Amino acid sequence: MRAVVLSEPGPAENLIVQDWPLPPERDGWVRIRVEAFGLNRSELMTRLGLSGDAVTFPRVLGIECAGVVDAAPAGSGLRSGQQVVAMMGEMGRTYDGSYADYTSVPLTQVIPMSTELPWEVVGALPEMIQTANGSLTIGLDLQAGETLLIRGGTSSVGLAAAALAKQLGATVLATTRRPDRLGMLKQRGIDLPIIDTGEIADEVRKHF
């Protein structure tokens, strides 16, 4: 298979597309045919050599992916060709990640899904949704009826957080520095879009 392999930390030129062994079938692991993957800052840090001793080389980077099941353990409930996403859990760090035609990850990291969205869209979702959802549920324990202010509301994580917060029943305020984005925030269900001048406390207090 093809893979983007980082032989050692350094410049982007150290990332080389080359032939790489197909991950073998393993008990408790799922082999995924990768259709798309997002690019993450942590991968940049690894490429620059800033991930410490956790990463060994050569390594196929990539901490998230979207694709279809190629091989799964018996009794896993997953079937060949099923759409899935996977992320984190040392993926692309202590074992090869998603910068390849195929990757193999522990079953516990695989999330089945079904969508008609194009792969290039789905590939950007796992880490974005995980970051937003974890912030709202684990970090904030956001409850219905509460009010949430999102700085940087037009970013991918900001938009994801807003959508999830609305599903939880929260009132959502979101900021943007661009007046032409206010309409977009309103269309996304934001209760109060705010222009971020760097000093938004007074604007928020006008309404709450």
Predicted regions mapped to residue ranges:
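Extreme N-terminal starter segment of soluble prokaryotic enzymes
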Residues: M1-R2
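Glycine-rich beta-strand-centered segment in the early N-terminal region that forms part
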Residues: P21-G38, L50-M91
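Short amphipathic alpha-helix with an adjacent loop that forms part of the alpha/beta core around
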Residues: I200-F208
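Mid-domain Rossmann-like dinucleotide-binding core that forms the NAD(H)/NADP(H) cofactor-binding site
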Residues: L125-E199
